Amino acid sequence: AILKLLQDTSICDYLDIGTGTGRLLELLGPRVKNATGIDLSHEMLNMARTALEKSALENCQVRLGDMYDLPFEAASQDVVTLHQVLHYADDPASVIAEAARVTRQGGRLIVIDFAPHEEEGLRQDHAHRRLGFGDEDLATWFKQAAMQANAPVTLTGDPLSVVLWSGTKS
């Protein structure tokens, strides 16, 4: 779904916030000039480095970084993704604002996360702070961050559905 969303987008600089195992870097890396994944977990960064080495993606790198204080200049990225990360945030609006800060004019910010759900076990077992997000929440946060929201794409699942919310920097 993300490849389809970006099929007509030229990407020089790509940032994956909360990269985890680096899966999106592996997926988008062949299409971009420079890709960086950041994460607060040294363990996840090591897993991502290993995956990128196996994939021989020399244009991709990973580094330690905080989603609330990204180590990048303003307007430095063509595409920024938050893949299954926002539900860990205490302040999702601030994360969106910081991601938008580093997105270039005309660039894309893509949030991939759960639709609203009732799976309370994810709080205890996986430290989720939020049980999904509504379209209205993301639209509001995008607007506050000077992003023009695009129509969300829902991937229906049972019991969890995932939504791709995207915005273009105005």
Show where each model-derived region lies.
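Conserved alpha-helix/loop element of class I SAM-dependent methyltransferases that forms part
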Residues: 1-12
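Class I SAM-dependent methyltransferase SAM/SAH-binding core
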Residues: 13-69
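A short acidic, Gly/Pro-enriched loop at the edge of an enzyme's catalytic core
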Residues: 68-79
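A short SAM/SAH-binding and catalytic strip from SAM-dependent methyltransferases
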Residues: 78-91
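Short N-terminal helix/helix-N-cap motif within the alpha/beta-hydrolase-1
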Residues: 90-93, 119
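A short glycine-rich, Lys/Arg-flanked "PGG" loop and its adjoining helix->strand segment in the class I
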Residues: 93-108
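C-terminal alpha-helical "lid/dimerization" subdomain adjacent to the S-adenosyl-L-methionine
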Residues: 108-165
